[in-house]
Amino acid sequence: MKNSINGFIKNHLKVKVLYGNKDPLMKHMMTSSRLPHIVCSDGFEMSVQVGSHLYSTPKKVAKRYSAVEIGFPSEHEPLIEKWAENLFEDTPDFTDTVYSYVPVKVVNQVLKKHGGIDLTETLRRYKEVA
């Protein structure tokens, strides 16, 4: 798939080492990772993040992820609804929540549904806030 989330992560994940600990077992716990906020071709937006303190699998920097954390989509997206943290609230706001451990397969379906990642717009906005 041209717009797979794993491909996007591979090309755009920024990792910063926060602590110079030489212990290789601690390395993944002392990093901060960040991905650009995704803008799709139809205007749908969402944050997708991976890393040691996030709802993603695996927890370390990896070549491929099986599940990612999604945050604050621009509109209610039924494909990811069941992973919403606030699903059991009386009136959940699906645009104001985090979605934990969303399978990559589902994220790719969301991207396809919304026309794929508009990489030009995604990176333009990322440069504005970086």
Predicted regions and their residues:
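Acidic, aromatic-enriched beta-alpha/helix-loop junctions
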Residues: 52-93
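Generic structural hydrophobic/aromatic packing signal, biased to beta-strands
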Residues: 38, 70-72, 107
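Intrinsically disordered, low-complexity, compositionally biased regions/tails
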Residues: 11, 24, 55, 119-120
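Glycine- and charge-rich intrinsically disordered segments
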Residues: 1, 7-8, 125-129
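Low-complexity intrinsically disordered segments
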Residues: 77-130
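Surface-exposed intrinsically disordered loops and tails
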Residues: 3-26
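Intrinsically disordered, low-complexity segments enriched in small/polar residues
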Residues: 18, 41, 49, 69, ...
